[in-house]
Amino acid sequence: IVGGAECVPY
């Protein structure tokens, strides 16, 4: 969990 794929769909 670092890229942000689990936070935002961008």
UniProtKB/Swiss-Prot annotation:
Domain Peptidase S1: 1-10
Keywords: Cytoplasm, Hydrolase, Protease, Serine protease
pH dependence: Optimum pH is 8.0. Active from pH 5.0 to 11.0.
Keyword Hydrolase found: yes
EC number: 3.4.21.-
Enzyme class: hydrolase
Annotated localization: Cytoplasm
Tissue: Detected in muscle (at protein level).
Any Gene Ontology CC annotation: cytoplasm
Keyword Hydrolase among UniProt keywords: yes
Activity regulation description: Inhibited by the serine protease inhibitors Pefabloc SC, STI, aprotinin, benzamidine, leupeptin and antipain, and by the cysteine proteinase inhibitors DTNB and pCMB.
Temperature dependency: Optimum temperature is 55 degrees Celsius. Active from 30 to 65 degrees Celsius.
Gene Ontology molecular function, alphabetical: serine-type peptidase activity
Source species, domain of life: Eukaryota
Function: Serine protease which degrades the myosin heavy chain but not actin or alpha-actinin. Selectively cleaves Arg-|-Xaa bonds.
Family: Belongs to the peptidase S1 family.
Protein name per UniProt: Myofibril-bound serine protease
Lineage, highest ranks first: Eukaryota, Metazoa, Chordata, Craniata, Vertebrata
